[in-house]
């Protein structure tokens, strides 16, 4: 797989591919970043962007991970001291998930976001962005509020300035970050900064085929036990022959096949014996043709996800 194929793998959108191709031609070691608001519950949605960072490292990129403690503070997730401790925990988890520590710069927001240069650029951007545009860039929870705080309006402006002052070529995030990334693309040039290329990953559904929600117990947290994962997978939505909005197949596509050259589905001989797959497309085709049973996929997915999460569990012990 060449550099461009690695970068394109499992992404929903690149803005723009032409700019990306030019970057790869002109810069030997470009820099990409993701910002993570420190979270006590890292789930497989977070891991999807970690997987993309690993792909980018293999493609020769230097990686910056912003541990956005100030953003978390503005979002009322705790005191700066509390969210800094969670950020330290997140850093250890991301390394355990496979990020190359030697090739990754971990930056805390509080290390640069409280300085005069940063705040001056946020103020400059605030003069250029309308209130309606800032509100459109807020996260879904903030947009749904009748009376959001000013800090929640400032949040997307800060994300744009993060991209500028971290001096990255590429901003990576879930497709839910698109509005913020487009705000950066539209405005940073006028402030004297480069326009970032943006790579967006899909948003994964919960195990029941609906939106992930902690109240539904329908997502995989990286601190779930092996027993938790087998229990959750057993009741996961995986309609036979149906590949649309199938969370089990999504785990194979986005998390398992990128980390394993071959995937083995273990089955008793009376049900046809083990099947070895060398690509996700091969597995999907067999599933559509009903040559492999949903429960066999669930058991295999649980086994591989547990293997992926084992290094993280050692960090947590």
Curated annotation (Swiss-Prot):
One of its GO terms (molecular function) is ATP binding. A motif ('HIGH' region) lies at residues 38-46. A motif ('KMSKS' region) lies at residues 211-215. One of its GO terms (biological process) is tyrosyl-tRNA aminoacylation. CDD domains: TyrRS_core. One of its GO terms (cellular component) is cytoplasm. Its EC number is 6.1.1.1. It comes from the Archaea. Keywords: Aminoacyl-tRNA synthetase, ATP-binding, Cytoplasm, Ligase, Nucleotide-binding, Protein biosynthesis. It catalyses: tRNA(Tyr) + L-tyrosine + ATP = L-tyrosyl-tRNA(Tyr) + AMP + diphosphate + H(+). L-tyrosine binds at residues 33, 155, 159, 162, 177. InterPro entries: aa-tRNA-synth_I_CS (IPR001412), aa-tRNA-synth_Ic (IPR002305), Rossmann-like_a/b/a_fold (IPR014729), Tyr-tRNA-ligase (IPR002307), Tyr-tRNA-ligase_3 (IPR023684), Tyr-tRNA-ligase_arc/euk-type (IPR023617), Tyr-tRNA_synthase (IPR050489). It is found in: Cytoplasm. It is an enzyme of class 6 (ligase). Pfam families: tRNA-synt_1b. ATP binds at residue 214. Belongs to the class-I aminoacyl-tRNA synthetase family. TyrS type 3 subfamily. Homodimer. Catalyzes the attachment of tyrosine to tRNA(Tyr) in a two-step reaction: tyrosine is first activated by ATP to form Tyr-AMP and then transferred to the acceptor end of tRNA(Tyr). This is Tyrosine--tRNA ligase. The gene is tyrS.
């Amino acid at each position: 797989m060449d550099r461009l194929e690695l970068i394109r793998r499992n992404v929903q959108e690149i803005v723009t591919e032409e700019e990306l191709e030019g970057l790869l031609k002109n810069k030997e070691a470009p820099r990409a970043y993701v910002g993570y608001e420190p979270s006590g519950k890292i789930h497989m949605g977070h891991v999807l962007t970690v997987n993309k960072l690993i792909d980018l490292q293999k493609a020769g990129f230097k990686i910056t991970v912003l541990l956005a403690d100030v953003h978390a503070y503005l979002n009322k997730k705790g005191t700066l001291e509390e969210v800094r401790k969670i950020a330290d925990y997140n850093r250890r988890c991301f390394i355990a998930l496979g990020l190359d520590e030697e090739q990754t710069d971990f930056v805390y927001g509080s290390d640069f976001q409280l300085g005069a240069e940063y705040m001056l650029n946020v103020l400059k951007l605030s003069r250029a962005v309308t209130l309606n545009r800032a509100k459109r860039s807020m996260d879904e929870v903030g947009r749904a509020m009748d009376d959001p705080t000013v800090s929640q309006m400032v949040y997307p402006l800060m994300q744009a300035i993060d991209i500028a002052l971290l001096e990255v070529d590429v901003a990576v995030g879930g497709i839910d970050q698109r509005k913020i990334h487009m705000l950066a693309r539209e405005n940073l040039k006028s402030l004297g900064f480069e326009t970032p290329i943006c790579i967006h990953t899909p948003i994964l559904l919960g195990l029941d085929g609906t939106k992930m929600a902690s109240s539904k117990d329908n997502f995989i947290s990286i601190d779930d036990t092996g027993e938790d994962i087998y229990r959750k997978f057993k009741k996961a939505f995986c309609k036979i022959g149906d590949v649309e909005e199938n969370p089990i197949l999504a785990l194979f596509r986005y998390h398992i096949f990128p980390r394993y050259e071959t995937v083995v589905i273990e089955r008793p001989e009376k049900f046809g014996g083990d099947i070895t797959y060398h690509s996700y497309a091969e597995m999907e085709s067999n599933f559509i043709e009903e040559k492999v049973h949903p429960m066999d996929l669930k058991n295999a997915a649980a086994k591989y996800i547990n293997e992926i999460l084992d290094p993280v569990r050692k960090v947590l012990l």
